[in-house]
Amino acid sequence: GFVQSDVMAYAWDGVRAFEQDGATHDFRTLGGLYAETVQLFTMDPDIKTVEDLKGKSVSIGAANSGVYFNALDVLNAGGITLDDIHPQYLSFEDSKESLKDGKIDAAFIVAGAPTTAITELATTNGVYMINIDGAIRDSILSDCPYYTSYQIPAGTYPGQDEPVETITVKATIVVSENLDDDTVYDMTAAIFDHADEIASENAKGEELSLENATTGMTIPFHEGAARYYAEHGITVDTKGE
């Protein structure tokens, strides 16, 4: 199945949304696919930094969702608690409409960039993308190994003239630990041997690479996937060590 790389880490460790159910180790990583970018945006030109969110109404995604925990990580790194803002638990579409209607001041979205909701708002009303960088980003990267640095290129959204610094998790494929090695090997080969063909049909396919597949993964790889990567000169962890 498909999962954010941070969410699979929560499941493996039995934390956050998986605290009640406890840790589960019955799955393995096949590989990372593309960036699920943490995007913080506003229509208010006076909100320029994460710290400027204090006292503001901010959409942080549905409670216990991947977006919610990503937003918490950013806020916490900026010294902001939920008591310091007016949190709103909205979907991407509702975040867009609430910004447009002036009901919220800023929103977090975690998805591949460009994201339709942000593109639509940038086209009709204009948006400001807020950088997640400096000490805040350094703190997050230090504490949470499933995040990596990311730069949203200039021109990704209408009116976005400068690149935006942020962080990302990855859309990841996981498989059952009991799936046989040959099947997982063939699945891995089917994706990465045909990356160019996939990219011709879907823009996110341009991010498919063996480097993206194997970096930022905190959960052990399936032996079948590991065999494929080894044939291409990449050694991955299959034991959780």
Question: Where do the protein language model's features map onto the residues?
Answer:
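Pocket-lining segment of extracytoplasmic ligand-binding domains
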Residues: 5-7, 14-17, 46, 82-174, ...
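N-terminal targeting leader peptides, primarily classical Sec-type signal peptides for secretion
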Residues: 48, 76, 238-241
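Structured segments of extracytoplasmic/periplasmic soluble domains
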Residues: 4, 10-14, 18, 43, ...
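An extracytoplasmic/periplasmic, membrane-proximal ligand-sensing/linker region
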Residues: 94, 101, 111-129, 139-146, ...
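Ligand-binding clefts/hinges and TM-proximal coupling segments of bilobed small-molecule sensing domains
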Residues: 57, 63-73, 146-218
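Short, glycine-/small- and polar/acidic-enriched structural segments
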Residues: 1-54, 59-62
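A generic structural-conservation signal
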Residues: 2, 62, 84, 108, ...
